[in-house]
Design a protein with these regions (language model features):
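Generic, ordered loop/turn and secondary-structure boundary motif
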Residues: 29, 34-37, 70, 108, ...
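Left-handed beta-helix
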Residues: 65, 70-71, 76-77, 82-91, ...
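Terminal amphipathic alpha-helical/low-complexity segments used for targeting or macromolecular assembly
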Residues: 1-65, 176-206
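C-terminal segments of enzyme domains that contribute to small-molecule binding surfaces
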Residues: 115-134, 138, 164-206
Length: 206
């Protein structure tokens, strides 16, 4: 299972990063792939109740990659963390295959409550740079979260959300091809910028 997940992670990197040249280079140099591999080892030890060892491994991964993933987080194969520095994934988070996470993104909790307090990210979601997804809700399949957005409630499938707090600016047809390329991310970031400018104009008018 470990090696299957690793292969899926490498395939996800090749599919989503135009700078990726070959599998060997990705395996050797991509911090996101390294962080996910470390995490799966930590997750194994966490499941068999060796929690201190799991935390030590996760902290080593954080030191070497700049990506912090709690050893209890559930992450499927085929996830791509691009650039990765500053990414944080909390204890009860779940991330499904096809998800792309950019640098500085946080899958965090709210408050000090126990139990499910981090988000569930369904398949083929894009979480842009600096976005914060906070709480124990679900981000639906194929959703896009704009750069710097702060998401505090459930996101429907195929929705694009931007702003602080995040709001829906578009819901795509489920039959549309999900665009997780860099061009697609730029379009999402542009929507985020436009929404921010609109908010500033509204505040000035008030």
């Amino acid at each position: 299972m470990f090696f299957k997940n690793l292969r899926d992670d490498i395939k996800a990197a090749k599919a989503n990063d135009p700078a990726a040249r070959n599998s060997f280079e990705i395996w050797l140099t991509y911090a996101g792939v390294h962080a996910l591999s470390w995490h799966r080892v930590a997750y194994f030890f966490h499941k068999i109740k060796l929690k201190l060892l799991a935390r030590i491994i996760s902290q080593m991964a954080r030191f070497f990659t700049g990506i912090e993933i709690h050893p209890a987080a559930k992450i499927e194969g085929g996830v791509f963390i691009d650039h990765g520095m500053g990414v944080v994934i909390g204890e009860t988070a779940e991330v499904h295959r096809g998800t792309v996470i950019y640098q500085g993104a946080t899958l965090g909790g709210t408050g000090k409550e126990r139990g499910k307090r981090h988000p569930t990210i369904m398949e083929d979601v894009v979480i842009s740079a600096g976005a914060k997804v906070l709480g124990g809700f679900t981000v639906g399949k194929g959703a896009k979260i704009g750069a710097g957005a702060v998401v505090l409630k459930e996101v429907p499938p195929y929705a694009t959300v931007v702003g602080v707090p995040a709001r829906i600016v578009r819901i795509r047809n489920p039959e549309e091809e999900g665009d997780k390329t860099h061009a697609g991310i730029i379009a999402t970031v542009a929507l985020s910028h436009e929404a921010h400018e609109a908010e500033k104009n509204e505040n000035v008018q008030e």
